[in-house]
């Protein structure tokens, strides 16, 4: 264990000594970065802010080096979470590549994902895990095409829950198929976790009806739940978390409800009526307030007030994966990707700590890259 004192004070809160219980599990070079992150977040926080850690697209089985750096980052997250006043930790999906085609491939895949959950159980804060398009192991069919829709290799919804949010069930209110919400105590804020890989796992003759490699999107049941259950709390702030947002259409069909979700977000943020397909909700007198929508998937970084979504603050965190194979999926609209990651130093890491208030969002970078902000003028 490593102890370090900090005497920062903010709004009458004084930071106590910092105890890095996981310091044996990441490089020595992380320690200064952890202390800097804790202090920066503490200085940014106010009584009306929400703060959280967001790490995404780890793809930890890309190489042994990638896996090692991913675990380093997860243990660092534990120490930051446990020595700060952040409100929660979110894993944004695509935790691995989902290509285990061995006869026991599903077991290997589930063990890989659950190893992440087990580390994050060391956090004394809520943990939310989002499902990405790679996470059901259906990309095993890229290794062996005979495994297309093969239920023996694809992680179904019950199995997904057992290796992810079952470990954090107290933070998964009204859990459905990878989507759920949580009300942050004392903060008048509801966090809504969505599932862009909401595939139908009905099995017929050994074949699953849909799978993550081919189905991107939100079933009608999820949209109905979002409108009538998740967004039903009055007079509170809302944060939406999902593996993907709206800028990269590849993988989505016309039945994916992707555009429906975007229209809901725009209407909720601007307090205007929404109607699309068979869904409708008049947000004109809705008493909720949408703070932001945060995602990954593109392996690129960006924070904007998105004009195509009614001016909604959209945050996109780039991939935390340490690999020469790492690349981004958007080359326009202001997306970017940090370079210069160096193994064995803090720059091998990359995740964001967000401190959010209405129209005022600070993004604190752990690892390579710089802190930045999104503020309405």
Region locations from a protein language model:
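Sec-dependent signal peptide cleavage junction
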Residues: 1-7
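N-terminal active-site segment of His-dependent metallophosphoesterases
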Residues: 12-106
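Extended active-site neighborhood of metal-dependent phosphoesterases/phosphodiesterases
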Residues: 30-37, 101-225, 307-316, 320-342, ...
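Structural recognition of the beta-strand scaffold that forms the well-ordered cores
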Residues: 51-55, 87-92, 97, 126-131, ...
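Active-site environment of divalent metal-dependent phosphoester hydrolases
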Residues: 61-64, 97-100, 131-141, 199-204, ...
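Active-site-proximal segments of metal-dependent phosphoesterases and phosphodiesterases across multiple
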Residues: 105-110, 200-224, 231-292
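Conserved beta-sheet core of the metallophosphoesterase superfamily
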Residues: 253-357
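Short, solvent-exposed aromatic-acidic interface loops
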Residues: 365-375
């Amino acid at each position: 264990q490593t102890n370090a004192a900090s005497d920062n004070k903010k709004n009458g809160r004084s930071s106590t000594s910092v105890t890095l219980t996981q310091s044996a599990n990441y490089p020595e070079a992380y320690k200064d970065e952890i202390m800097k992150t804790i202090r920066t977040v503490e200085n940014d926080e106010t009584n009306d802010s929400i703060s959280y850690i967001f790490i995404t697209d780890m793809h930890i089985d890309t190489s042994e080096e990638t896996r090692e750096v991913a675990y380093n980052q997860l243990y660092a997250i534990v120490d930051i979470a446990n020595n700060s006043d952040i409100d929660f930790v979110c894993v944004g999906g695509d935790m691995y590549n989902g290509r285990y085609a061995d006869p026991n491939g599903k077991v290997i895949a589930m063990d890989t994902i659950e190893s992440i959950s087990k580390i994050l159980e060391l956090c004394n804060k809520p943990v939310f895990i989002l499902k990405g398009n790679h996470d059901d192991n259906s990309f095993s069919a890229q290794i062996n095409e005979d495994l297309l829709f093969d239920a023996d290799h694809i992680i179904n919804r019950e199995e997904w829950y057992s290796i992810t949010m079952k470990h954090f069930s107290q933070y998964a209110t009204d859990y459905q198929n990878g989507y759920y919400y949580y009300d942050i105590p004392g903060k008048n804020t509801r966090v809504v976790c969505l599932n862009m890989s909401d595939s139908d796992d009905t099995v017929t003759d050994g074949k699953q009806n849909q799978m993550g490699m081919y189905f991107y999107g939100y079933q009608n049941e999820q949209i109905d739940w979002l409108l009538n259950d998740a967004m039903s709390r009055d007079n509170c702030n809302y944060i939406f978390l999902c593996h993907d947002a709206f800028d990269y259409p590849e993988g989505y069909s016309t039945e994916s409800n992707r555009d429906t979700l975007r229209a809901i977000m725009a209407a909720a943020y601007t307090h205007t009526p929404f109607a699309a397909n068979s869904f409708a909700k008049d947000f004109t007198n809705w008493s909720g307030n949408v703070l932001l929508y945060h995602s990954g998937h593109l392996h690129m970084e960006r924070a904007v007030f998105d004009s195509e979504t009614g001016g909604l603050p959209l945050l996109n965190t780039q991939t935390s994966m340490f690999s020469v194979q790492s690349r981004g999926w958007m080359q326009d609209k202001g997306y970017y990707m940090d370079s210069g990651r160096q193994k064995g130093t803090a720059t091998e890491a990359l995740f964001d700590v967000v401190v959010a208030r209405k129209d005022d969002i600070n993004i604190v970078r752990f690892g390579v890259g710089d802190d930045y902000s999104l503020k309405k003028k």
